Amino acid sequence: MTTVIEELARRLPDIDPSSWARRFELGGVYLGGRETTPDSPITTSCRLEYYDPLYPIDKADEYFPAFRSEMILLMDEDIGVAWKPAGLPTTAPRDQRLYNFQRYLTEHLKRPVHLPSRLDTGVAGLLLFSLSPRMNRHLQKAYDKKLIEKHYIAEVVGDFTPEKVEIRSELARDPRHPILRRVVSAGGESAHTVVQKIDAYKRVETSYSLLQVEPLTGRTHQIRVHLAAEGFPIVGDPFYNGAMAPELRLISYALRLYHPYKRTMMTVELPRSAWPDWLVERVNLSGPFSISYREEKRHEGCSIS
């Protein structure tokens, strides 16, 4: 009977045989939809999948951002807020299982960590996590009821108008690629995003707008697709025709939610020490900005049982 490693070597002869041990260590090999080992036997009914990494496997430690304890900004026995750097997956992707923020947090804290929402790999910023089953349940209900505010900062080319807009549409997979999304007239998932212009400014001869963006639903690439559909793709977003830049200029900047066990509102903003260079440059050009939060009455009923 053929084994997984024998079949991979037969089908992928261009891959150095000596590299397979490291490739299995990283992950990315699946048999029947589950991670597998080199010596696992293959039956005729099993599907074998291999996801080739897009980075040098011998330099993965350099490719992905490293974890530092100061990335945890606040934490109690139930909940925490951390800063995830751009370039690090929130959870394990299909091509590898070693380098992701959830794994780093779990290993650092030596306890299970639940992530009620995720950030795209290219997005930096605040990430909420829970540490107890009771908080897991609360956060899930709070997200379902849209009681957790997540505010992003985005930079786009041009003078964004109107000053504030609510975007509602349906999003579905783009047939060109399984990761991409697009706006559809019917048959997709409903998506709702509130966009407010913070400032307009120029770098050299190009006009830019700084936007505060609050997604009220949590669809894949929701902010990126909605802004692109409005004619203002995010700077540094090659997936949706954004202007060229070395990074995606979208960050998770602020969180606001009710802590049910301390009976208080939590408001967390990204500390300046974690700001990307493009945001620091903008503040140096135009001065400080502030986030507009929802009215307090919008948070009535936050104590979910």
Give residue spans per PLM region.
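RNA pseudouridine synthases
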Residues: 1-305
